[in-house]
Amino acid sequence: MDRLVTRDRRIGAVNSRPQPPFDPRVGALLAEIAAQDGAPLRRDGRPLDLRAADLSRARLAPLAGDAAWWDAERQGLNLAGAEIAGSDLEQADLTGATLKRARLTGAMARSADFSAALIEEADFGKADLSGARFTGVTGGQADFTEAMLEDASFRDAALRFARLPRSLLDGADFSGADLWGADFTGADADYTRFRGARLDEVNLCDTNLTHADFEGASLTKARLAGSRLRSAKLSGAKLDGADLSGADLSAATLVRLDLSSCSLRHARFAGAWLNGTRFRAAQIGEAVGEEVDGEYEAAKASYLALEQNFESIGSRDEAGWAYRRRRRMGRLHAGVQFHEAWRDRDRGGVLRHGYRWLADRFVEWLCDYGESLSRLFRAFAVLIVVFAGLFGLTGGLIPEGSGAPTYNALDLLSYSALNMMTANPPEIGIKPVGRVTNLLVGVQGGTGIVLMGLFGFVLGNRLRR
């Protein structure tokens, strides 16, 4: 019996343990709100000092009753329409509070907790909200213009048409958030997480999204023109109708995406992981962004990524286009290096880069880097005419039964053409006479053999495609 009595006393002592002392700052705030008689709180430039104050739903609910400072419908502190700009809310707990249309511009609210709060049309412009928690908030049209939101959490928040232009969002977490129509123009959002978020029709133009994570997010008709998506993760993202014009997708993960309805004009792809990603070369325009900006070495890497992707989806013609552009970027880069070496009076560099430029330029003219049959036909025609002219100049082609050289254009062209396409000098009643003429015949025959082999290689490429 004594043991039971002792146990009951212990339980009673635990249940009657006093709550933490009520913060007098909180009491003063509640009294001030009640004195407004239903009107929004106006501080007239006098900021609140509520650092580490507990204004949470759980703390105030036992005291609320029908108090004027309590939002009975939402079960939280009622600060709707409050003018509390510049207030100190660092580490304050405002979970469940009603802050609809409240003005908190310039507030200091680092590590504050706004979870489950109503912040529709609230103004947090230029506020310091680093590490703050906005988990599950309802915040349509909330304004975070130029706010500091580093490492802030907006998980599962409803922030349709929210404004976050030029805000600092490094490390922020928007996983599962509804951000339909939100504006992030010019924001800095390195390492920000948007996993599974709804970002339809969002404005992310000129936003820094380096290392951002969009895995599984919906970006239908999103505007990402000029955004920096270096090393961003977009696996499983939905990008129907998105505008990626001029976007920097260098080293981004773009595996098995459907970009066929996206605008990709002058986008950058150097080092991007593209595999099974569906889009057409025409969507990029005449050149990738690196080439437009004169960054030929990076453009070469960009076209390589495109070439490999087009191969992976079986689009061989477009893979050939990307290959040719890649080779051309190599030539242009060699030209830039040649000019730099010339300016620096680097003879070795001049010879090395000059030779590379000339070799690439010749191969481009000859067969467009192994992709053009028409250019090979042109090379054949040019060489036939050139050698026919040389044969005429040397006067070394003598018709059989005649001691005089022929200068007939038909004789010269027919002999030159047959000599280009046969292994031995043609037997058409004309004999080459003289050392120079025989040397020309040999050189032309060897050149013809090389061109015929190249013709077979290019033809094989075309047949495979």
Per-range role (PLM):
Residues 344-394:
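Transmembrane alpha-helical segments and their cytosolic interface motifs
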Residues 301-305, 314, 321, 357, ...:
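Generic recognition of stable, solvent-exposed alpha-helical segments in well-folded globular domains
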Residues 2-323, 330:
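Tandem repeat scaffolds
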Residues 383-406, 460-462:
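Juxtamembrane "helix exit" motif at the C-terminal ends of alpha-helical transmembrane segments
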Residues 363-370, 396-450, 454:
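Pore-loop/selectivity-filter region of tetrameric P-loop cation channels
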